[in-house]
Curated annotation (Swiss-Prot):
HAMAP family: UPF0173 (MF_00457)
Taxonomic lineage: Bacteria, Pseudomonadati, Nitrospirota, Thermodesulfovibrionia, Thermodesulfovibrionales
Keywords: Hydrolase
Name of the protein described by the UniProt record: UPF0173 metal-dependent hydrolase THEYE_A0282
Organism: Thermodesulfovibrio yellowstonii (strain ATCC 51303 / DSM 11347 / YP87)
NCBIfam families (alphabetical): PRK00685.1
Gene Ontology MF annotations: hydrolase activity
C-alpha cells in the first residue's frame, strides 16, 4: 500500500483552491502526476531504477497512462517508456527530434506520437481537453540515444530539455530534466508562478546541491522536490547538502522530501 502524505498548502500555494493533484516519485527523475480529473502523466518513467526496490511492482500496478513526457534520450530517462506505452496506449510528449528517434530506434508505438504531442523550446501545447498545458523548456545537458545493436551506437536525440506543466485547477510544475544551472531559469521565475520544482541535485552528470540551490532561487517556486541523486554511488549529491545550501543562501522555498514510492496529494 502506497503511503499518502496529505499536505495543507494554504500558506504555501496561492489562495485559490486547487483540486486534488497527486505526485508520486519513483526515484531518479521518474514521476507520476495524476490530475484532479484523473488523467495520468509520467515523466521520465524509469520505475525499475536501482534505487526503487519495488519498481517491478510499481510498474505492474500502473493505472491507465495518458501521456509519457521524456526530457531527453538517455536510457535512464527513457526507462520503461516503451513497455508502458505498448501496455497503456500512452501518447509521447517530446521534442520532434527526440520523439522521431525513439519511435524509429527504440520501438515506441508510431501511432502514439505526432504533431499533437510534440513541440520545441519556448512552445506550449494544450492536451487532454485542456486539462494540462505543457511548455517545452531548454536544459544544459546531452541527448544521445544508445542502441547497442545499431550500426551507430549513439543516435542523435535532439536537444535535452525540461517541462513546465500547468494543470487545470491544480499546480504549475517545473521538471528540470538533467541540466546544469543556466541564467535563463530566471525567466521562468519572472514569467510564471511555479508551485513545485523538481530539480536534479546528484552532481557529476548534472548540477549538484549548490548549483541546484541557485537554480531554485532563480525559479522561486513555492516548493522544490530534489531528484536524480543516489540512484548510483556516483550521483553523490544529497538532500542534506541541498538543504544546507538552501538555508545558507536564505532561499524561502520549502523542500518537499518524498520517499521513493510515496505519493503527495496537493489540494
Amino acid at each position: 500500500m502506497k503511503k499518502l502524505i496529505f499536505l495543507l498548502l494554504i500558506i504555501l500555494l496561492p489562495v485559490a483552491s486547487f483540486g486534488a493533484t497527486e505526485i508520486t516519485w519513483y526515484g531518479h527523475s521518474s514521476f507520476k502526476i495524476q490530475t484532479p480529473n484523473g488523467k495520468v502523466l509520467l515523466i521520465d518513467p524509469w520505475l525499475t531504477n536501482p534505487a526503487n526496490k519495488e519498481g517491478k511492482r510499481h510498474l505492474k500496478e500502473l493505472p491507465k497512462v495518458d501521456l509519457i513526457l521524456l526530457t531527453h534520450a538517455h536510457g535512464d530517462h527513457i526507462g520503461n517508456s516503451i513497455e508502458i506505452a505498448k501496455e497503456t496506449g500512452a501518447k509521447l510528449v517530446a521534442t520532434y527530434d527526440l520523439g522521431k528517434a525513439i519511435v524509429k530506434y527504440a520501438g515506441y508505438p508510431e501511432k502514439q506520437f505526432g504533431y499533437e504531442t510534440t513541440g520545441n523550446f519556448g512552445g506550449e501545447i494544450t492536451l487532454l481537453n485542456g486539462e494540462v498545458k505543457i511548455l517545452f523548456v531548454p536544459a544544459v545537458h546531452s541527448s544521445a540515444l544508445e542502441i547497442p545493436d545499431s550500426p551507430k551506437s549513439l543516435i542523435y536525440g535532439g536537444n535535452p530539455g525540461g517541462f513546465l506543466i500547468s494543470i487545470k485547477n491544480g499546480p504549475t510544475l517545473y521538471h528540470t530534466g538533467d541540466t546544469d544551472l543556466f541564467e535563463d531559469m530566471k525567466l521562468l521565475g519572472l514569467m510564471y508562478k511555479v508551485d513545485i520544482m523538481m530539480v536534479c541535485i546528484g552532481d557529476k552528470f548534472t548540477m549538484g546541491p549548490k548549483r541546484a540551490a541557485i537554480a531554485t532561487k532563480f525559479v522561486n517556486p513555492k516548493m522544490v522536490i530534489p531528484m536524480h541523486f543516489g540512484t548510483f554511488p556516483m550521483l553523490n549529491g544529497t538532500v542534506e547538502e541541498f538543504e544546507k545550501e538552501i538555508a545558507e543562501q536564505k532561499i524561502q522555498t520549502k523542500i518537499l522530501k518524498i520517499k521513493i514510492g510515496e505519493t503527495v496529494k496537493i489540494e
